[in-house]
Amino acid sequence: MAVSSLGPEGMVDLNKFRLRRFVEKLNKLGEVDVIEKPTDLSDLATLIEENLRAIWFKDVGPDNLEIVASVNGSRYRLAKAMDVSPDNLVSEYRNRLKNPQPVIEIKNPDAPVQKVVLTGKDADLSRLPFYVQHQLDGSPYISSAIDYTVDPETGTTNVGCRRLSLRNSKEAGTNLTAPSDLKRIYTDACEKG
């Protein structure tokens, strides 16, 4: 896949694909329940599980975080993410898989993901909104975390979206029992020692 530093017109619209823009769009379509009142992290799982709509929590936990859940929890919302009707969702997925777009690289410090960078003692995973999601969870989790790995054999980048389990302030883990590219990369590395 080609890498470009600029978009097709020489400019990158940094807001076009922001999660906040999509949630605002869904909210205008009546697909989001907005919870303004303070919400404890321990209450999230029940509130999310009981609701079929997306939920936008405006004030969660001691740090007063905003959290959104179930954004992709229906075919309708997935279709809206791709600007197609639900009837055209599968064909749109197939079309996009067959026609990958070039990667647009945004250099530091312009990348929105680089607005807050914590290092050393300031890098503390427990400051993120991990919470117990299911009755039998052995630890708090964060949903829809993006993991990024590079296959050492091929150099191919692998990106996955998984639940991460909080181990301590510096470590999180994930489940590698389900078939995935990450599991294959891990298994291959273990076999090589």
Q: Can you annotate each of these PLM segments?
A:
Residues 2-193:
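Extended, highly charged
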